[in-house]
Amino acid sequence: MLVYQDLLTGDELLSDSFRYKEIENGMLWEVEGKWVVKGAVDVDIGANPSAEGGGEDEGVDDAAVKVVDIVDTFRLQEQPAFDKKQFVTFMKRFIKNLTPKLDAEQQELFKKHIEGATKYLLSKIKDFQFFVGESMGDDACLVFAYYKDGAADPTFLYFAYALKEVKC
């Protein structure tokens, strides 16, 4: 199994069990999340409650909770929303921190295409939920979630060049 870590913090952000599609000249990965129910346990112990005088559905309240699979699996932490000015400030710092960690070929491609990816993200800024990895580091890479038109499940966007592939 492959895990993708934040190159700046080492936080696990994604794995190969979630399929991605490259967009914006390979700058961003688009990943479909899913709402799932966590904690709902339906245990059949083989008893017949009606024959034993028991009521329907007696027992423990198992506190089922709906969560988004990617957020839950990688313990992503939601961040306050950014306005355009805050996002541009973040991007300047992010580019400054990430560029030295890339090899020469990656740096060239990153510098060539990051402006287009930034404009794409800015065009959707009001629709995003913002997440970072578990450590919530100041220099952490952002993960963006939004709902496509009519979608019931969120779509996540990752900065491809900020992910480091690790075999588990």
Swiss-Prot record:
Residues 1-168 form the TCTP domain. PANTHER family: TRANSLATIONALLY CONTROLLED TUMOR PROTEIN-RELATED (PTHR11991), TRANSLATIONALLY-CONTROLLED TUMOR PROTEIN HOMOLOG (PTHR11991:SF11). It is found in: Cytoplasm. One of its GO terms (molecular function) is calcium ion binding. The gene is TCTP. One of its GO terms (cellular component) is cytoplasm. Keywords: Calcium, Cytoplasm. PROSITE patterns: TCTP_1, TCTP_2, TCTP_3. Gene3D superfamilies: Metal Binding Protein, Guanine Nucleotide Exchange Factor, Chain A. Involved in calcium binding and microtubule stabilization. Belongs to the TCTP family. The keyword Calcium applies. Pfam families: TCTP. The keyword Calcium applies. This is Translationally-controlled tumor protein homolog.
